[in-house]
Regions:
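Glycine-rich phosphate/diphosphate-binding loop of Rossmann-like nucleotide-binding domains
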Residues: 7-24, 28-29, 33, 149-221
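Short glycine-rich or small-residue beta-strand-to-loop segments that form or flank ligand, phosphate
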Residues: 5-14, 72-77, 184-190, 300-307
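Buried hydrophobic positions in well-ordered alpha/beta secondary-structure cores of metabolic enzymes
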Residues: 12-15, 69, 130, 172, ...
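Glycine-rich phosphate/pyrophosphate-binding loop and the adjoining helix
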Residues: 140-186, 190-194, 312, 317, ...
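Buried hydrophobic packing segments
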Residues: 22, 26, 204, 298-306, ...
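N-terminal beta-loop-helix "entrance" segment that forms/cooperates
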Residues: 35-58, 228
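Glycine-rich phosphate/nucleotide-binding loop
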Residues: 47, 104, 227-330
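N-terminal glycine-rich phosphate/adenylate-binding segment common to multiple enzyme folds
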Residues: 50-155, 243-245
């Protein structure tokens, strides 16, 4: 029997609750399947670790998880610690050195969930957003000078490379090719940003020739927000820069009903490093410890993890279980307008997994 080693990193806030729920569900799924198992190694990195040690994770933290098959992550963010410290000290400290350059965020309206778009019932909104996850606006290149003085200045340099842009656009074309519609939208801001964004457009046109069976178009990012709201059915696979896709994917999650159900995969497609899977929602300290966090985003992220590991049947079973639960309004958490809690939803998904008719 294959045993997968999973690094479980809850992080901060409700991360502990949703990752714990995810571990329970994955254990139940493995027991139901019977052909594979999980070994979960738990790491207490995050804001509380920072308060004790002055850093978000140990100096040898990456070495500790380097040989795991995958990483299940919760959230990064602590009300007593600056956001740039929590993000760069933990999540990005894993993503970038592990070259998880493809951030993949599927978006669709699950059964039983209502979109705020009044004309959309479900099939019209079925997207996958591909976010460049290693460079661009979040390259970490920049600095501050003359701090505290009237002449203080700061820069954040958006660093784009031909290699980085080429690999994410090629990844997006391959993903679009694997989907029924075979359609890709490339999002930039090349009308105003005339160097790196123009390079994106040019590289997209070059790589498109490798995929003659994939139709594609390009959009300016501000116009893209309108298209997502007004013509969601016109979109399928979307690729954009680190910053642009970060923003667009949050909009997408809201249009699909809630950030609480949205998943993310941070992929190293070549398999040289472990990939990381996490819900989109943040640490949500306002509801921490109340048992109100929606675990569906973590469960859906676990589906993506299973698919990445090659456990296609188990991934499909878990997705069906999730959809069976979301279809019941009585199992909706407060972010979806319901009164269910994390425990109730987790138990329901486990019950669906073990049901004979799934």
């Amino acid at each position: 029997m294959k045993t997968y080693r999973i690094a479980a990193i809850p992080g901060d806030g409700v991360g502990t609750e949703v990752v714990g729920a995810g571990v329970e569900v994955l254990k139940a799924l493995a027991a139901r399947d019977g052909t594979f198992a999980f070994q979960f190694d738990h790491f207490d990195w995050g804001g509380e670790y920072y308060k004790k040690h002055g850093r978000m994770m140990p100096e040898d933290g990456r070495a500790q998880i380097r040989n795991h098959d995958a990483i299940l992550f919760g959230s990064a963010g602590h009300p007593e610690i600056a956001d740039h410290i929590t993000l760069w000290g933990l999540r990005l400290a894993i993503c970038q050195p592990f070259d998880q350059y493809a951030n993949v965020r599927p978006t669709r309206i699950l059964p039983g969930i209502v979109s705020p778009l009044r004309k959309v019932n479900g099939p019209e909104l079925d997207w996958v957003i591909v976010r460049e996850n290693s460079e661009g606006e979040y390259s970490g290149v920049g600095g501050r000078v003359h701090q505290g003085l009237p002449i203080e200045a700061a820069t954040d340099v958006s660093m784009m490379t031909r290699a980085g842009v080429s690999r994410i656009i090629r990844f997006a074309f391959k993903l679009a090719q694997s989907r029924p519609r075979k359609f890709l939208t490339v999002v930039t801001k090349s009308n105003a940003q005339r160097y790196a964004m123009v390079m994106w457009d040019e590289i997209a046109a070059e790589i498109a020739k490798e995929f003659p069976d994939v139709a594609w178009d390009k959009m300016i990012v501000d116009a893209m927000t309108m298209r997502m709201v007004l013509r969601p059915e016109s979109l399928d696979t979307i690729v954009a820069t680190n910053l642009h896709a970060d923003i667009l994917s949050d909009l997408a999650a809201a249009l699909a009903g809630s950030l609480g159900i949205a998943p993310t995969a941070n992929l190293n497609p070549e398999g040289e490093f472990p990939s990381m899977f996490e819900p989109i929602h943040g640490s949500a300290f306002d509801i921490m410890g109340k048992g109100l966090a929606n675990p569906v985003g973590t469960f859906w992220s676990a589906v993506m993890m299973l698919d990445h590991l090659g456990e296609k049947n188990a991934a499909a079973r878990l997705m069906k279980a999730i959809e069976r639960v979301t279809a019941d309004p009585g199992l909706h958490t407060p972010d979806l307008g319901g009164t269910a809690n994390t425990r109730t939803v987790t138990n329901a998904v486990i019950g669906a997994i073990t049901a004979e008719n799934l």
